[in-house]
Amino acid sequence: MVYRWDCRHCAFSAWSNSDERLRKNAGAHLFDHHSSKLSKADFRVAWDCPYCDAGETAHDKGAAAQAFKDHLDWHAGNSIESNAHLADEVENSGNVLVQTAADSAAADSARLQFTARSDLSIIVTKSPKERLRLLHDRFNGWPDRTVVMTTKRRPLAGAFDIDLSDAPVEVVELDRRLGPSQLGETISRVIDAHHTPDQRLAVGFDILYDIVSSFDLQTTHDFVSMLSSRLSEADALWHIYAEPRPQLSTALNVLEEYIDLTVETESGVFVVNG
C-alpha cells in the first residue's frame, strides 16, 4: 500500500509505503508553515492550532514545540490518501527523475511503484540480478514482458537462484563500447520489437551518472533529448535514478526541460516540491 499527502498551503506532496512515516513528514511540513503559532507569553511558551481550538502553554520551549508538532501530525494524518502511486502524478507517462542512489532502498521502492502498472518493463542497469530479484520477490507475477539491458558481463552468473526459464524475461548484454547514441538506438529497437500501442511501457534507467561522467554535456543532452522524444511517442514512463552530487548539477540544469517530475527522498518518504 502506498499513501499520499498533499499540502493545502503550497505545492508540496509526499508519498510513502508507511502511513506513520508519511504522517510525521507531513506534520513536520505543517510545523514549518505554522511555526509562528508558537510564541512566548509571560514566562511560558504557548501554541494555538490553526485548524482547531487546541492549544497548550508550557515553561519548556522544547516540550511545547514537540506537543505542537505531534498535534499537527494528527491533523496531517486525517488527510492522507491510501492506494496512491507516484506514477499518478504524471498520469503514468512522462519523465521522472528520482534523486537517490540507483542501488538504494528508496530507489527500489520507487521502481516498484513505477513498474507495478506496466505491461512492458525495460530496465537499463549495471545491477541486473538485483533488479530482477526485486520484481520477483515483491510482485505476484512478472509484467507481460521484462527486458533488462546491462553492460555487466555474464549478468546472471554466480549466486542467482531465480528460475527464469519460463518467465517472460529477456536479459540483453550490451557492448561496453556502446556510446549514448547506440544505446538509445538499442532501446528503440527493443520498443519496436515488444511494445504495442495498448500496452503501458515503463523504462527504468540507472546509468545517467555514468553517461554524464563519460561523455561531454552536448552528447548527454542529445541522448536525453532523442530518447525522451522516442519514449514520448510510445507514451512511456521513464523513471531515472541519480543521486544528487556536484558532478551532476550542471547536467541536470541543462536536462531540466526534459524532466516532468523531480522526486526527492527523505527517510523513506518521496517528496515533490511544486
Predicted regions and their residues:
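Residues immediately within or flanking Cys/His clusters that coordinate Zn2+
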Residues: 4, 44-46
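Short cysteine-rich clusters marking metal-coordination/redox-active sites
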Residues: 7-10, 49-52
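Cys/His-rich microdomains that often coordinate metals
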Residues: 14, 55-56
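C-terminal recognition-helix end and immediately following basic linker
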Residues: 15-44, 61-81
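Phosphate-binding/switch loop-helix module in NTP-utilizing enzymes
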Residues: 155-156, 163-226
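Substrate-engagement module of ASCE P-loop NTPases
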Residues: 211, 215, 222-247
